[in-house]
Amino acid sequence: MPVLHNRISNDELKAKMLAESEPRTTISFYKYFTIASPQQTRDALYQVFTALDVFGRVYLAHEGINAQISVPQSKLETFRQQLYTFDPALDGVRLNIALEDDGKSFWVLRMKVRDRIVADGIDDPTFDASNVGDYLKAADVNAMLDDPDAVFIDMRNHYEYEVGHFENALEIPADTFREQLPKAVEMLREHADKKIVMYCTGGIRCEKASAWMKHNGFNKVWHIEGGIIEYARRARAQGLPVRFIGKNFVFDERMGERISDEVIAHCHQCGASCDSHTNCKNDGCHLLFIQCPQCASKFNGCCSEQCCEELALPEEEQRRRRAGRENGNKIFNKSRGRLNSKLSIPDPAE
């Protein structure tokens, strides 16, 4: 029986990836379809991906698959063929190719079985996730942005919205997708007669959100096909104005893809114009925040003086201090509440 999980340390794997000479392509894809045996499917797909030297993060559940991966360019066409023939439901599935890509997005393959491919908190047996809103392509998106009867809804987290979003899009203030869904219904009641356009990074969240809105009585619901990634790619290919402003946050080592030249966010420590996310260098904190190069140097990559001082302690003392809190911090390191409690975010610099 082959080993169906990684047994090499992260440091060794990362060093091996960085030493690679062959370029890689970063890809994301998802598909809602019924998987009778997620664990069996996971194990079979793991062997296919491992044989092709695929790195990345893949979630499987009874409701489908969600993947963010990198593939050696010489094996990209073979990967595409094997994925499309793995299951009839995956034949022709849209592959979102990264917009900015140095091939260093992942260094290990992790495949997990979960209850849902997107944690939505929905516990309603009458909900039909397949009853989704209509797709919008790039030209349609631009037309909707000029339609006074349309309302754009950003179904991403606060830290994603902060660095980039569509013009005049509404933010749903919540830390997680499961918290956003009921809030979106509540916030949009006053816009029930409007055209509701939902979007996210690659399409997986806004597709389910569109079905949830329809389930709650909204009739005029659309979502952007392929999310921000596919919109920007198609708009550029077709010579259309790109109406997304700023950076598209991504969940890998890059932490973002530049869509437009505008920098709409600010350093959380000094207020300077900046949209570069980082995790606090103190492993006992790991807070996700925006930090400019000057503050990165001043605070040694940390989010605060306290974390900077802790990072300077002997390693044994650091381990003692973070015992019992490290896992919790890594789980909640993106919450708005924790960000506000750790940092007194200044007003943007003049």
Curated annotation (Swiss-Prot):
What GO MF terms are annotated? oxidoreductase activity, acting on paired donors, with incorporation or reduction of molecular oxygen
Enzyme Commission code? 1.14.-.-
- Cystine residue pairs: none
- Write out the catalysed reaction: uridine(34) in tRNA + AH2 + O2 = 5-hydroxyuridine(34) in tRNA + A + H2O
The active site annotation covers C200 (cysteine persulfide intermediate)
Q: Where is the Rhodanese domain?
A: 146-240
Q: Which UniProt keywords apply?
A: Oxidoreductase, tRNA processing
- Top-level EC class as recorded in UniProt: oxidoreductase
Compositional bias of type Basic and acidic residues: which residue ranges?
Answer: 319-328
Concerning Pfam families, the annotation shows: Rhodanese, Rhodanese_C, UPF0176_N
List every stretch annotated Disordered.
319-350
One GO term under biological process is:
tRNA modification
Taxonomic superkingdom: Bacteria
- What InterPro entries does this protein's entry cite? Rhodanese-like_dom, Rhodanese-like_dom_sf, Rhodanese_C, TrhO, TRHO_N
Q: What does this protein do?
A: Catalyzes oxygen-dependent 5-hydroxyuridine (ho5U) modification at position 34 in tRNAs.
| Stated family | Belongs to the TrhO family.
Question: Can you name this protein?
Answer: tRNA uridine(34) hydroxylase
Q: Which organism is it from?
A: Salmonella typhimurium (strain LT2 / SGSC1412 / ATCC 700720)
